[in-house]
């Protein structure tokens, strides 16, 4: 009897999986970014002639202003062709106001215009404020959250300004000592 009961449970479970797969096929996504205040054009190299032009950036979701709403930081690319003065693409920080996102990039002082690849957020200095690390094609940047809606460049002070080609980044307590550790993935070393 146990064998038959297990077979029945297995059959029911499989039917549930098939139902879930069928339901998932009908899911549709709708672009609501502009309606929610996120108005950004992500730039990548136009010619795709160089390897870096084929790479795009990322995003970090974190509560930078400690209001309980998850905010959004989006990295941007660049181009070797160059840009007119004041037209260079930059990374953006959008504050979540509950129903709408507000671009606070300039006030927060995180409008990095480097060729950014990735970002991650964590409280690296244990001051209760979530900080931000951005990887770039060039110098990476650590932004220390000042707690007043603005960030300060803490790259040199923290000694984490690698000038290679940083692509990915994450924070975690690797050695379990209670302090947040930083792990940066680099791509190509052009000096070889």
Per-segment meaning from a language model:
Residues 20-192:
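Acidic, glycine/proline-rich Ca2+-coordinating loop motifs
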Residues 9-20:
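Bacterial N-terminal signal peptides
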